[in-house]
């Protein structure tokens, strides 16, 4: 193993949103797992504008004597991936591990991720074994993974699992990307030379419900489409051409049928004509909506507003170390 592959410090980044029930156990289990490491470590918990007592619990944990915890408090809810990027800005380790706060992926897998990363991988992903989710979410996740693999060329089986390890140069490359719509696993793989995956346990959620509502899942789907590729825009031209050709063919067919069967038949085909017309109009609106989604995201990027606003960072000693590293 080369010197450049050795890991000197590990940073754990965990986004938190209304997880007050799971936080005590999360902190306890994550700290216990990190104590098994041979490297120094820090645990950065990012409160993504929680409306419960999550921020207070994180602040108290960060203020404990000899605490390895840094609490990053955002002023409002920005979303999971923006919260993780806020945590990335605070890390001082050369291996960064992301983890969800719901404990569906066990923190006890952290030492194994570190061990695999030491083999020289830039990104270590995970695949959830015996996934404890609904059939709808499993099916949607499988379709998304297939789409991502085709677009990126990176054959990874579970892009939706956020228990992942990244080398520091990968995180720094992601921080230099300023687009607001970000899906971190995909973005990381665009910079990674060597990637791998390991299988991890997946448990049922013990506390609360998933924070991804239907609308958030739809927004995530749009993020995936627009951050992956511009192929849908090219497909619009292809679909438009097919619709135009179909419309022309149908028009010729209707004229021929009218000449053969007479005007009485044409009167009977009005409703068919309207049905086809509505289909074409619907396809146009779908295309306009997709085009508008791209334009809207370009508009957000051009405004160059920050992805998030950090209200407070708690954990004085760790924060000072981070500032020294950044200098």
Swiss-Prot record:
Top-level taxon: Bacteria
Function: Catalyzes the transfer of 4-deoxy-4-formamido-L-arabinose from UDP to undecaprenyl phosphate. The modified arabinose is attached to lipid A and is required for resistance to polymyxin and cationic antimicrobial peptides.
Organism of origin: Yersinia enterocolitica serotype O:8 / biotype 1B (strain NCTC 13174 / 8081)
Residues spanning the membrane: 236-256, 270-290
Membrane topology (UniProt): Multi-pass membrane protein
Family according to the record: Belongs to the glycosyltransferase 2 family.
Record GO biological process: 4-amino-4-deoxy-alpha-L-arabinopyranosyl undecaprenyl phosphate biosynthetic process; lipid A biosynthetic process; lipopolysaccharide biosynthetic process; response to antibiotic
Matching InterPro entries: ArnC_tfrase (IPR022857), Glyco_trans_2-like (IPR001173), Glycosyltransferase_2 (IPR050256), Nucleotide-diphossugar_trans (IPR029044)
Keyword annotations of the record: Antibiotic resistance, Cell inner membrane, Cell membrane, Glycosyltransferase, Lipid A biosynthesis, Lipid biosynthesis, Lipid metabolism, Lipopolysaccharide biosynthesis, Membrane, Transferase, Transmembrane, Transmembrane helix
Cellular component GO terms, alphabetical: plasma membrane
EC assignment: 2.4.2.53
Coiled coil stretches, renumbered: none
Pathway: Glycolipid biosynthesis; 4-amino-4-deoxy-alpha-L-arabinose undecaprenyl phosphate biosynthesis; 4-amino-4-deoxy-alpha-L-arabinose undecaprenyl phosphate from UDP-4-deoxy-4-formamido-beta-L-arabinose and undecaprenyl phosphate: step 1/2; Bacterial outer membrane biogenesis; lipopolysaccharide biosynthesis
Name assigned to this protein: Undecaprenyl-phosphate 4-deoxy-4-formamido-L-arabinose transferase
Major place of residence: membrane
Subcellular location field: Cell inner membrane
């Amino acid at each position: 193993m080369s010197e450049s592959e050795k890991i000197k410090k590990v940073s754990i980044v965990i986004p938190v949103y209304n997880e007050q029930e799971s936080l005590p156990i999360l902190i306890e289990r994550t700290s216990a797992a990190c104590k098994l490491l041979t490297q120094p470590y820090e645990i950065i918990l990012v409160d993504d504008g929680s409306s419960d007592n999550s921020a207070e619990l994180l602040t108290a944990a960060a203020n404990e004597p000899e605490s390895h915890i840094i609490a990053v408090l955002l002023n409002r809810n920005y979303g999971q991936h923006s919260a993780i990027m806020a945590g990335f800005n605070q890390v001082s380790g050369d291996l960064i591990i992301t983890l969800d706060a719901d404990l569906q992926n066990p923190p006890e897998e952290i030492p194994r991720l570190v061990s695999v990363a030491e083999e020289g991988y830039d990104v270590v992903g995970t695949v959830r074994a015996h996934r404890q989710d609904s059939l709808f979410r499993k099916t949607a996740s499988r379709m998304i993974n297939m789409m991502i693999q085709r677009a990126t060329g990176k054959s990874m089986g579970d892009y939706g699992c956020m228990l992942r390890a990244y080398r520091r140069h990968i995180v720094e490359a992601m921080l230099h990307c300023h687009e607001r719509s970000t899906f971190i696993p995909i973005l990381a793989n665009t910079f990674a030379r060597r990637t791998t995956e390991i299988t991890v346990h997946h448990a049922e959620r013990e506390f609360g419900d998933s924070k991804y509502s239907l609308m958030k899942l739809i927004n995530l789907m749009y993020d995936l489409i627009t951050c992956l590729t511009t192929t849908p825009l090219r497909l619009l031209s292809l679909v438009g051409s097919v619709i135009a050709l179909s419309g022309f063919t149908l028009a010729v067919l209707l004229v021929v049928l009218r000449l053969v069967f007479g005007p009485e038949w044409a009167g009977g085909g009005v409703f068919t004509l309207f049905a086809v017309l509505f289909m074409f109009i619907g396809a146009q609106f779908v295309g306009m909506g997709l085009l508008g989604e791209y334009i809207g995201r370009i508009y957000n990027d051009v405004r160059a507003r920050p992805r998030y606003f950090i209200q407070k960072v708690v954990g004085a000693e760790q924060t000072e170390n981070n500032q020294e590293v950044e200098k």
